Amino acid sequence: MRFALLPAALCVLVVLLVAGCGGGSDEPDRDGATEQAPVLGSQCDDEEAAPGELGFPAFATRNTTRVGGADAIADAAGVAQAVFPSRDRDTRPRTVALVDTADWRVAVSAAQLMAPPLRAPLLFSDGGELPAATEQALGRLIPTGAKEAGGAQVIRVGEAAAAEGYKTTAVEGADHAALAQAIDRLQTAAAGKPSGAVVVASSEQPGFAMPAAGWAAKSGNPVLWVTRDAIPAATRAAISAHKRPRIYVLGPESAVSKKVLDQLSKLGEARRVSGADPVANAIAFARFSDGSFGWNVVDPGHGVVFANTQRPLDAAAAAPLSATGTYGPLLLLTAANALPAPVQDYLLDIQPGYDKDPVRGVYNHGWMIGDESAVAVDVQARIDALLEIQPVESGDAA
């Protein structure tokens, strides 16, 4: 395309927000991050219109988009505004879930509130305060109020800071297990009936639990908690409220023992979905299907979300992306600068292909969650190539 064909004031990039805002979360330092915020509104002859200044390739490639927060607070704010652009009443959320960064388990459980009918994206408080990114996001989102939550604009979960000036309802519980039960109780009341399935995950090993957040956001199934060898009373009570549901235990025996699985079987039909490590576990969950439960992503034409196991709060922050748009499961990296071989193999398995015309094919898309300390641009570029549609006579990635 020739520049002469473009209006003189254009060459604009739309981008998702992102600076670090956390003070007391479990996220590692971000000193190694190198990406810059893109410049909006640059003219084509400006020096600022260079690809790096416009944000390419870090913020977007042909098949990937990055929410480049230095922490989960910024990522959640960016995701919420990507899912709800809030330019008019129809593009605003009705309510928002506000969770503190102090407990990743509560955040993962709160992802359930993104499911219908509440459709509440998640924002974070930090140490009893609202970070600037959260305040700004709330001010832009301006939730309209959810009648299923008593007209609340904000659902304050646990010890989250108060959002002054917004009609708020509180979800309370003594600990993460009790809060998960209370979150599920609110979702059940809003939906009018309990879901037929629940997810049970390890409260001790976040890498195995992270993929549950996106599924909860899509399905409305609760994420309930156990230790390796025990089931909290609140979890038992929450499962019982679903009247012998299908119980899907996410993670291997090293995370949730057979003894616990056997005990869960007394409360409903219990089944394990697992991989030997967090990377393999996430892939197993992405592939899994049992009736109406499970992603069943075993062929091309899907969205996928990528996050780093070192940032468990990002799973909750990103959950709305699994419940809107291209939908899709969470896959995991264990290091920013390396794409695990099992993830590469899985992406090759679901890579789109075409016979004669790529326009007649289906397409994959990937969301990168976090800055370059979470997902390096080199890894993003490799993922982009693995997502690209290919001629069927060539099995090679672009």
Question: Which residue stretches match the model-derived regions?
Answer:
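Residue-level detector of alpha-helical hydrophobic segments embedded in or interacting with membranes
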Residues: M1-R2, A33
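Sec-dependent N-terminal signal peptides
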Residues: R2-L13
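C-terminal motif of bacterial Sec signal peptides marking the signal peptidase cleavage site
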Residues: L17-G20
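Extracellular glycan-binding segments that recognize GlcNAc-based cell-wall polysaccharides
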Residues: G23-A398
